[in-house]
Amino acid sequence: MRALFLLAALLISLAAPARAADDVAAAQGVIRSQVEAFSRDDAAAAYSHAAPAIQEIFPQADIFMSMVRNSYAPVYRHKSFDFGEARVADSTIVQRVHIVDAEGIPWEALYTLELQPDGSVKITGCVLLKAGQPV
């Protein structure tokens, strides 16, 4: 019985990092898909990755895209977009992204994403800072 308990504890401890890695991979896939939609000017696809709370603030895909173009130009159009450090806490994923905008200026984006009740991952926010600027 004790051996069974130890085996169960070991399996649980090994599953947590694997789940976190799966969550990060899913989050990166969502971010990548949204950025690709921005590059195609596909408002519907980009909007589909926004969490319900974001969709409440921006009730139509074209309104959402206008906000991104005006407030998140380095995310909307860039020379490079590379994933950095990620953290997982409960159902929230925080993903750092290193961006070089169309003019060659480096930026850091801090994305937050949440696991949804249906199992999908949606973007709940993005903070954009010039590289080296304190958070």
Protein language model features and the residues they cover:
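Short solvent-exposed beta->alpha transition segments
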Residues: A25-G29, A43-T92
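Short, low-complexity N-terminal intrinsically disordered segments enriched in polar/charged residues
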Residues: A16-R40
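Alpha-helix boundary/capping and short turn/kink residues
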Residues: R40-A43, G104
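Exposed beta-sheet edge and beta->alpha loop/turn motif
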Residues: E85-V135
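Short, histidine-centered active-site or binding-site loop motifs used for metal coordination
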Residues: I12, A50, V127
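Generic anion/oxyanion-binding catalytic loop in active/binding sites
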Residues: A9, V35, A53
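Bacterial N-terminal signal peptides
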Residues: F5-A15
